[in-house]
Amino acid sequence: PAPLPHEPATSLHGRTPGLAEEHFAHDGLITKHAVRAVALAALRPMPGQLFWDLGTGAGSIAVEWCRTDPTCRAIGLERKAERAANARTNASELTLPGQFDVIDADLAKGLPEGLPDPDAVFIGGGATKALVNQCRPRLPIGGRLVVHGVTMEAEMLVETLHCDLGGDLIRFGVETADVIGRLHGWKPARTVVAWTWQRTE
């Protein structure tokens, strides 16, 4: 397969999900590399498949999807212009031309018209039951939908989705060694709830 452009996506780091945050343009709010690795494990990108990243932010999940194979494609939807601009920069720097497209869209108003049907969908923030219900019928048999959240409201939503629709529900946290004065300790990140659903019929 054709190599992906730029060293961060190829020889130095390979294509395994979890590219360090320093390689992305972002405003400080970015899905951390360990959380991205968990998300991509659930999304299971396959060659030639199309991915929707809803509320793409810096586009880090979509970039990771595209890095797995040159034929993978992604569409990222983002409401905030500054974050959409960062996502476009990351698409240009870390994916092949035409592999990752970013669309300015307010998902509170629903999905924009004309989107091609995806093989997998990720909602990393701002998930609602209505948005989930819009996405589910667009997936093919075997398509994957993954929702992440860090708020109590998101946790209540995914618990409801899990009760109503099944799927897998996990909650996990990541702690990083950090300096405490002259000593060291563990600095926890926000706990993430993650719901994964696969269409079977």
Predicted regions and their residues:
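C-terminal substrate-binding/active-site "lid" region of AdoMet-derived donor-dependent transferases
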Residues: 132-193
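Helix-to-beta-strand junctions that scaffold the AdoMet/dcAdoMet cofactor pocket
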Residues: 69, 96, 139-141
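Short beta-strand element of Class I
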Residues: 71-75
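Class I SAM-dependent transferase core
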Residues: 1-47, 52, 86-89, 93, ...
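Conserved SAM-binding loop of SAM-dependent methyltransferases across substrates and taxa
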Residues: 58-70
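Conserved S-adenosyl-L-methionine
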Residues: 55
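S-adenosyl-L-methionine
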Residues: 77-120
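Active-site segment flanking the S-adenosylmethionine/decSAM binding pocket
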Residues: 102-147
